[in-house]
């Protein structure tokens, strides 16, 4: 896998399966996947992240979508949010749906 940053829209992705993943479970699975793939990740949360770590950021007074939309490319986006996907399509090398990411990537670890 390329070493391109993989940006994960946390609230969108954790709600892509039933039952919904907790913030902590999403972080644990995303980190396990990143280690296995050798890929850097950035998990972006609405509000504060569940812990203070360099691979997790909160949105402050904005939405996670706005934070992600302001990121410089290139990056991969993991989100099923159509509006966000449209906002970043010129900078995203690859866009992966949240459910697909959880089923295919995270369960493979």
What is the predicted role of each segment?
Residues 3-8, 12-109:
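Nuclease catalytic cores that cleave nucleic-acid phosphodiester bonds
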